[in-house]
Regions:
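Alpha4 helix (beta4-alpha4-beta5 surface) of REC/receiver domains from two-component response regulators
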Residues: 66, 70, 90-93
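Conserved acidic carboxylate
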Residues: 7
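Short amphipathic alpha-helix used as the core "switch/output" element in two-component signaling
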Residues: 67-80
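Acidic, metal-coordinating helix/loop segments flanking the phosphotransfer/catalytic sites
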Residues: 17, 32-55
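Active-site residues of response regulator receiver
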Residues: 58-60
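Charged phosphotransfer/docking patches of two-component systems
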Residues: 10-17
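His-Asp phosphorelay/catalytic-motif detector in bacterial-type signaling
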Residues: 52-54, 79-83
Length: 93
């Protein structure tokens, strides 16, 4: 299973990775590959090259012009078969 994290803050990148590794240990999934992207632009560049991921954790408030919501729309437009989980610390979402 390919899991991707699109998060611009290192602290939260690590927290999400730790949660995934804990889940992996509890469920005995040995075939997990985690990729971390610090910006939506980095992720879009790979998606444009037909890169695939099964599960994607996206921070809603990414630094830069493209938000996590924008990234999700792009993935939808590309008709990729990816499950998206939005992550945020903001109460308005």
């Amino acid at each position: 299973m390919r899991i991707s994290i699109c998060e611009d803050e290192l602290t939260y990148q690590i927290a999400i990775q730790n949660a995934i590794r804990h889940w992996q240990a509890v469920t005995h999934h040995d075939d997990i590959e985690i990729s971390v992207f610090p910006s939506s632009d980095d992720m879009i560049d790979l998606l444009d090259k037909n890169w695939e991921t099964d599960l994607l954790f996206i921070d809603i408030q990414l630094q830069g012009e493209t938000t996590g919501i924008d990234l999700a729309h792009k993935i939808h437009e590309m008709q990729l078969d990816t499950t998206i989980v939005f992550c945020t610390n903001y109460n308005q979402y």
